[in-house]
């Protein structure tokens, strides 16, 4: 099967095009850094495989995700490249395009966002550009799918009759050096003359990834030639001179191809940015927007729908299952397991799906509109005080959905110590798995202020992440503040299709988790409550679960929720935070009183909020721990990532409850 790779700058629509060409769905965000590892999909019509590579501005990598790109181009086999460029930022995008053309591999150029360019008054004669580059160009709007069908039909012809032809003349002295380098590379390696020229050019540009691919003897010879030509060129460095020549080539190339409107015209984005990124009112606006989202999720839409679903699962559905089991003569043990264990446990989590869907819809709306990238800029000013940059906030925002992709997104951070710091604080971001816990408790104890209480927990998670990052960056991970440079995407009206797919995929992941982790956890919790030292079908107060819960309940006694039931829910929370709610449903619903009544009797508003603080901050789930181990390659950092949140959660919850107890 033929392999084709898709490449481009960050946030030019690579993943949107990938989804359109393969019919699959990968996470899309209107900001840079969404793709951090290569993703493989099967092209429609069995054309071949398409590999979506992380966005990069240059083939000389400065972050882990960009290393994936260069490594793939050098070491993997592919039939051609699809280079997608932003038509509204064509000059900047051509920097990468020129480097890809220097590979002299079959290539198509996808001219994306032509709708945005047209709205800005930018006119592009792509036919003329195609003739100049001698490379096929396909205008597309990846977000809506316009033009992608034509591109798909042509991909199978990519490479047919291709003849390497692209070459930029870097001047007599540099060209002579490139020629000498090519001779060494072709003699010492298996690369042909076109690959050798590309390697020589990248080596002169100080691409360390290229140097790592060559043996030390070749590197020494090439370094000697690079040092020699550095003394001959009149520029500050060979790299600067080559970049100047390349920029001149691009300017000449686009001179009669692109027509821009008057520079005095102020775009809609610029006017809005002055308000939304204002250093004084930008943050209050963001908090107000988040409050509206939580108000909609927990008061106006989400909770009423969840109540209806809860009534159905706990009433009609459960009664129907019981009737069917009685009719079939199912043994009492299995009846109890299914109704009191599986349905009670899994159902108690599934009832929050409407709230999850509403929250994910609005988060996706903010992402696709381009607003979230502005928040990263806004937060950069604040995060500098805590030893981080705005680039760390992008993974943190992703963490509101799930901490695992949040940790993976840290690959886009160039500074290694900042990347590691971001990984260690990412679990403090309140992921969707914690939402059922919040929804349960705020619905019982804080009915009038549900959105404010949940918002306070999200803000608390961010504050704690900042405080911990301050400690880390001033001690074990001390580093200089990195400069945050980010391209602000154009504001756009989100695509209904994109919003639906994004919301559906996230909600589907939540439901899938209910059918695996939560199902398994519910069965185990119920069995532990059913079995004890004296046999089976024992009173829950004589069960193994009671024994385990009593031990942990004693440990958290000073935190305000020191019952054995609460203690028993904390242990399976390591598996997945949603299991906390399913465990409560099984434990608290085992008696005659309902779940809500028992929780009201065992918690107060103060201890309920203390419990939510502890759930927010204590150990990450097992999937997050695995992701931390994978990204840090260290058991030491992984152990720290498990231990310090537990200590932090205990200390902060203790202080909150004990101080609060003095006033309540």
UniProtKB/Swiss-Prot annotation:
GTP 2 binds at residues 33-37. GO terms for molecular function: ferrous iron transmembrane transporter activity; GTP binding. It comes from the Bacteria. Pfam families: FeoB_C, FeoB_Cyto, FeoB_N, Gate. Its main location: membrane. Keywords: Cell membrane, GTP-binding, Ion transport, Iron, Iron transport, Membrane, Nucleotide-binding, Transmembrane, Transmembrane helix, Transport. The keyword Transmembrane helix applies. CDD domains: FeoB. The chain crosses the membrane at residues 281-301, 342-362, 382-402, 425-445, 452-472, 516-536, 544-564, 567-587, 608-628, 637-657. Residues 1-161 form the FeoB-type G domain. GTP 3 binds at residues 52-55. It is a multi-pass membrane protein. GTP 1 binds at residues 8-15. GO terms for cellular component: plasma membrane. GTP binds at residues 112-115, 141-143. InterPro entries: Fe2_transport_prot-B, Fe2_transport_prot_B_C, FeoB_Cyto, FeoB_GTPase, G_FEOB_dom, Gate_dom, P-loop_NTPase. It is found in: Cell membrane. PANTHER family: FE(2+) TRANSPORTER FEOB, FERROUS IRON TRANSPORT PROTEIN B. NCBIfam families: feoB (TIGR00437). Probable transporter of a GTP-driven Fe(2+) uptake system. Belongs to the TRAFAC class TrmE-Era-EngA-EngB-Septin-like GTPase superfamily. FeoB GTPase (TC 9.A.8) family. This is Fe(2+) transporter FeoB. It comes from Staphylococcus aureus (strain MRSA252). The gene is feoB.
